Amino acid sequence: MVRLLVIIERSDIPMKTEIIKTTDVHWDEKVKHLGEIIRNGGLVAFPTETVYGLGGNGLNPEASKKIYAAKGRPSDNPLILHVSSQEEVSRLVEDITPLEKKLMDAFWPGPLTIVFPKKDIVPDETSGGLKTVAIRCPALKATREWIKECGVPIAGPSANISGRPSPTTAESVLHDMNGRINAIIDGGATDIGLESTIVSARSGKIVIYRPGGITREMLSAYGEVEVDKGLASPNMHPLAPGMKYRHYAPTAPLTVYVGDTEKVEQTILSFAEKKDKTYGYFVSEEMAALLPKDAVVFSWGKRSSQKEMAHRLFSGLLYFNAHPVDAIIGEGTSMNGLGLAIMNRLTKASGYHIIVESTQDR
């Protein structure tokens, strides 16, 4: 009897995801290895000052397709290109206006993404089919070293399953991406905790497509600033990354209350008296102090510190995935400063379920 041994290569077996720390004593050698992964068409999650990104060769259409597949992200949602310096931009874009150059000089390296008209070298798979491309230079030195070693711009949306909160630690990346990508660069917890601000500066004024760590007030020092009207619409066509589709959503439905502080407190406290569901509370320290001791609470910090709220925003949304509740009751903030970016994320996380409380409701 002749036995035939057939070996079948299974595509459903996940790859092994390795974790490499930026503090590794052999970091210089690891950077070369990580660069090789990218040049070979692989995917590497990487830290920035904002959130962790999911990186691939931004000039390789197949690598961009892999990014969309790993995230479960619609392919008409464009990807940001990350560069290690300003000098890398000119080969990717048609031209650079004086205002764009001013913004790069002022905020790069840092959490500002600028939308440019792209050259053909940037594939449609990366730009989401648009004739423009969004580019930024991250602040984290280790990440810039790695991008330089790669020799190509890195296409990098946030390193999470599409629709979920963006990751601010390597552990959160591993939870979503283990077996989906080749490697994770562990640079510790991110500093800002919100994604970059995305702007266009083509028309002589600065248009904010996505608010972030660089605020409207900071940008106003360099020209007239306008907030794109599409930020308030759930059905708009994406002109820049992160403008379309539900984002940042925890597993449980989220409702956010803003407005008159006393009225917001009364409304949130009323849920603590209800027994129909298990509620979680994503609120300020001041509000948390008023809730029952046995309530499921994640405090985003003091009302006076939007920076702390921004830093803890995504970790708070992820907290309620690890501590399941039927519904989440959130407390919002004003639209000034970082509040514009914070409320943008909460608006999307809640599926546009924002309730404004006023003294007239009493």
Identify the function of each model-found stretch.
Residues 1-14:
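N-terminal amphipathic/basic-hydrophobic helices that include classical n-h-c signal peptides
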Residues 12-362:
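Active-site-adjacent structural elements in enzyme catalytic cores
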